[in-house]
Design a protein with these regions (language model features):
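Conserved phosphate-binding/catalytic loops and adjacent sensor/switch elements of nucleotide-binding enzymes
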Residues: 46, 57, 88, 92-159, ...
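Extended alpha-helical scaffolding segments used for macromolecular assembly and cargo binding
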Residues: 79, 93-97, 329-330, 349-351, ...
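Helix-loop-helix "sensor" segment of P-loop NTPases
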Residues: 74, 132-137, 152-155, 187, ...
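Internal alpha-solenoid helical repeat scaffolds
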Residues: 103, 198-200, 205-207, 236, ...
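Short secondary-structure boundary elements
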Residues: 86-88, 227, 231, 235-412, ...
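C-terminal non-catalytic interaction modules
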Residues: 1-4, 10-53, 58, 79, ...
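N-terminal pre-P-loop "Q-motif" helix
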Residues: 54-69
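Alpha-solenoid helical repeat architecture
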Residues: 119, 305, 345-349, 387-394, ...
């Protein structure tokens, strides 16, 4: 069947794979005499592996490498075909596969360019040049000569040919390659964009499964991270991975070019052994990416180029509007070619699939061309800000700015607000500065400027922006804007210790003015809505100060739908109530309220910042309730469009994940996200986040037994000034004190007890219980009675764990501590469970309770493998099982005799008997049957 191709007709007869014998061309190496050249001359060979720099994308392609390796080492297989789009790493993968075979394999690289189909023996020309004249007389002789030459060069080693083609290869080369494959002279790794770019005979081989296709696509985000680790050689921040993946769409070639450009520009920096970004990615002037885009640009039609120009400037356009400007066929063809993507929303937004193309093309366009495109899309009318989504506003404002045109005051104000919502403070400041003092939008613009400064951790500048508003200007605005300005000022003053005490007077004055304006009006009257905003600021101030207990009745009234029809006020008050309940010992009530708010939050999507506020407070609620796994899930969620915000939000997400891990006792797992978060926060500080990162990292290192590093970060924490909300400050304090306790600092233990007493007096029972639980690893009876009393004011499984630990430790009851450990295990609090089991071992042995001692010791033995540094060791003198004792115990528990165990482990029977004696003593068992399930 292989004789159907043109290549087959050239040779007259090419047998099927099973019919290769005397009738076929000789595969014996010839003696070339004078016509030969030294081995390797003119050949592109790789016999000693590929330089690591050429295999930078290989770490993300391990599954593909395994498929290729299997195809090249299977007897029936003739090789593999690697297909995929431009830049996905086909050639890199082929080189990595060849290098993986090692020096015992002879490799030969062939290349065929776009014009290769028109040149006989095009990809074999350098082999053809080595043939003696006697073998140049006919295609058959050439085929025989090249086959034997390859066999001779391989010198008895397996041979792999890498055929890298960007287009079709000529029929003569195809025939020779087919002969080489079917005679077993070599196997092949063919690299092509599509199967159709290969000779027809290769299609038959694929159909018969003599060749295996490995189809490559762009990298997913996890693979992008693996490639970045390979390229950069150090940890990489989550924001770096997400931003780069979003920019290049997972294309490895573009990813490498982007890394090179960003390192040269200084935006990609190594901070404390973590690669991260200084600022947003800007591709203007990126030479290597520019070359890649120009190469692709040259192959597109003029109509396609114009659509690309439009989308480069506008970022996205509604499908109906785009097809009104350009041919629908052109748009459809571009979508089929993978240039465009169309979302599923009602607007059917169209954008460039590969964002880097828009960035680069936009940098080519002159101001005049940008204005021409903008005029064509707008048709002489500017859009209304109220009708635009946040992302749409940002795109339009950026386009207008790039055209060096003026934004209308209304659009500049809306863009500043959108930039704050998208955590882009620099753009927010630039848009707010466009407004003049004479514009009626100037006062609200100052609010957004203050919010942007707060995001940059510059509260002094934020307050200055608000203080610039004169009293006459403040008196001239409406009641709602007045309330927003007061709320913004109160928010800024929270972060300035010398100003925080003035907030009650500020809010009281605002309430007096609004009460006069309200009269007997009810919501939705503007004055009532304004009064609600000021009341909300009062709750925020009290929550920031930790005054939770006293304001719960007021919050419950504000959060009651029957009493409060104002959705915005009600939902935000509910979020504060959720935190207040959590801190005052009503953890289960807080979790119930959290679920209810989570189900209603979509109905309040118009409330700016509500989702972020809810996520932040829900994290603390879950953390203090011991639900650390749900904390990880919460911060791991990323809504659509998140990559645009990642430089400002990734650090917070990684910090939150690290905090969840250290609260669970998993210091080792916490270090990666915490170190990454610190690297970003040291470049872009965000309020109290850097102090939180230092404290959590110190605790993580202490939990893993690395006292030197723990003390280093405790020192950094002490040298870093700052102010935080009550909940954040208490988490920082808790992490620092517990780190000190792990390091054996008696003052840290005393600090935890004092903190617990202060919290208890203030009604903050949750933090009191958590602090005292950490302080009483070696507590007194009085400590345990207090811990038990505090647990009685709390709700939920973590409170019950505290109560059982206190009761079991005070009464020295092993069974109570076993119950506490089992409950801690349901929360996956390994360090707390280990504490329970260590105490249970001691108390059970003191009481002669062999069953409880055996159960606790077995569980402690398992935990020793996961808890790097146990919080407490049994004091009864019996250490944990050694690795060899554990191995012998497992074998004995499975029924193996002492002699069988000795033979398997290569030791004497006497040694086995001695180890088993130690195992029985430590675990309190008397027979081998008791070992089953314990070890």
């Amino acid at each position: 069947m292989y004789s159907n191709s043109k290549a087959g007709e050239q040779w007259g007869y090419i047998p099927p794979p099973g019919d290769v014998g005397d009738k076929f061309m000789s595969i014996e190496p010839l003696s070339w005499g004078r016509g030969s050249t030294p081995q390797g001359a003119g050949l592109q060979t790789e016999t000693s592996g590929t330089p690591g720099g050429q295999q930078w994308s290989a770490p993300a392609r391990s599954a593909n490498l395994e498929s290729i390796r299997a195809a090249l080492t299977t007897d029936d297989s003739l090789g593999v075909v690697i297909t995929g789009g431009r830049g996905v790493g086909k050639s890199s993968l082929a080189r990595a596969a060849v290098a993986d075979l090692g020096p015992d394999t002879w490799s030969l690289q062939l290349r065929s360019g776009p014009s290769g189909a028109n040149t006989p023996y095009g990809c074999l020309s350098f082999l053809l040049a080595r043939l003696p004249q006697a073998y140049m007389g006919s295609p058959t002789a050439i085929l025989r000569g090249i086959t034997s030459l390859i066999r001779s060069d391989a010198a008895g080693r397996p041979c792999v040919i890498t055929l890298d083609t960007s287009g079709s290869i000529d029929d003569m080369s195809a025939g020779v390659l087919l002969n080489v494959l079917l005679t077993g002279t070599a196997k092949i790794i063919a690299v092509a964009p599509k199967i159709s770019d290969l000779p027809p005979d290769f299609h038959w081989l694929l159909t018969d499964r003599r060749l295996t296709e490995v189809r490559l696509s762009n990298l997913n985000e996890l693979q992008t991270r693996q490639v970045l680790l390979s390229l950069l050689g150090h940890r990489v921040s989550a924001s770096l991975v997400a931003t780069y993946h979003h920019t290049v769409g997972g294309n490895p070639l573009l990813l490498k070019a982007l890394v090179t450009e960003q390192k040269l520009s200084g935006n990609l920096v190594l901070s404390d052994s973590v690669w991260t970004l200084r600022d947003k990615v800007v591709l203007d002037g990126a030479a290597s990416l520019d070359d890649i885009v120009r190469s692709r640009w040259s192959r597109e039609t003029p109509e396609t180029r114009e659509v690309i120009e439009m989308l480069s400037c506008a970022r996205r356009v509604e499908l109906g509007r785009l097809t009104a400007l350009y041919s629908a066929d052109v748009v459809a063809d571009m979508e089929d070619a993978g240039l465009l993507e169309i979302d599923d929303s009602d607007h059917r937004w169209v954008s460039l699939r590969e964002k880097y193309i828009g960035e680069v093309v936009r940098s080519w366009l002159s101001i005049a061309r940008r204005r021409e495109l903008r005029s064509g899309l707008l048709g002489g009318t500017e859009p209304e800000p109220a009708e635009m989504a946040v992302d749409e506003l940002m795109a339009f404002a950026a386009w207008t700015h790039e055209c060096e045109a003026e934004l209308s005051p209304a659009l500049a104000l809306a863009a500043a607000e959108a930039a704050v919502q998208l955590f882009d403070p620099h753009f927010a400041l630039s848009y707010a500065d466009m407004l003049k003092r004479t514009d009626r939008e100037w006062v609200p613009a100052q609010r957004h400027k203050a919010a942007a400064y707060l995001q940059l951790n510059l509260p002094v500048q934020a307050l200055s922006a608000l203080d610039d508003i004169s009293q006459p200007e403040l008196d001239s605005v409406g009641v709602e804007e007045y309330a927003h300005v007061v709320a913004a000022k109160a928010q800024v003053m929270l972060w300035l210790p010398e100003q925080a005490g003035k907030i009650p007077a500020l809010l009281a004055a605002a309430k007096e003015r609004l009460d006069a304006a309200t009269g007997h009006a009810t919501w939705p009257h503007r004055a009532v809505a304004a009064a609600h905003r000021v009341a909300l600021s009062g709750f925020e101030y009290r929550a920031f100060a930790g005054d939770y207990a006293d304001m719960i009745p007021e919050l419950e009234a504000a959060a009651d739908p029957a009493l409060n029809p104002d959705t915005s006020y009600r939902m935000q008050a509910s979020v504060i109530l959720m935190s207040a309940l959590s801190m005052t010992g009503r953890e289960m009530d807080a979790l119930s309220l959290m679920r209810r708010i989570g189900g209603q939050i979509s109905d309040a999507s118009h409330v700016v910042g509500l989702r972020e506020q809810f996520t932040r407070e829900a994290f603390v609620v879950l953390l203090t309730a011991g639900q650390w796994r749900r904390c990880i899930d919460l911060v791991g969620q990323r809504p659509d469009g998140e990559p645009d915000r990642m430089p400002y939000r990734s650090a917070a997400s990684e910090l939150a994940a690290g905090l969840a891990y250290v609260f669970s006792g998993r210091g080792g797992a916490a270090l990666d996200p915490l170190i990454s978060a610190m690297a970003q926060l040291e470049l872009q500080p965000a309020q109290s986040a850097l102090r939180s990162a230092y404290a959590a990292t110190a605790l993580a290192y202490a939990q893993t037994g690395n006292g030197t590093q723990a003390r280093k970060y405790l020192g950094k924490l002490q040298r870093t000034p700052g102010k935080a909300s009550f909940s954040a400050e208490k988490i920082i304090e808790f992490c620092a004190l517990v780190a000190g306790r792990w390091l054996g600092d008696a003052e840290a233990v005393a600090g935890l007890k004092q903190s617990a007493e202060r919290h208890m007096r203030a009604g903050i029972y949750t933090m009191a219980g958590i602090s005292l639980l950490a302080a009483t690893v070696n507590g007194s009876d009085a400590d345990f009675r207090l811990l038990e009393d505090i647990a009685g004011h709390r709700q939920g499984p973590l409170a019950e764990v505290s109560r059982l630990i206190a009761l079991g430790s005070r009464t020295k009851d092993a069974k109570t501590l076993l119950a506490a450990g089992e409950l801690a295990a349901t929360l996956e609090l390994d360090a707390v469970e280990a504490r329970c089991m260590a105490l249970a071992v001691d108390f059970a042995r003191q009481d002669g309770d062999a069953v409880s001692a055996r159960t606790a010791q077995a569980r402690l033995d398992i935990l020793a493998a996961t808890v790097a540094n146990l919080p407490i060791m049994p004091s009864s003198g019996s250490p944990l099982l050694t690795a060899r004792e554990r191995q012998i115990a497992r074998l004995a528990g499975r029924g193996a005799s002492n002699r069988d165990i000795a033979l398997e482990m290569g030791v004497s029977v006497r040694t086995v008997e001695g180890h088993l004696y130690q195992v029985f003593t430590k675990l309190g068992v008397t027979s081998r049957g008791d070992l089953t399930g314990l070890v």
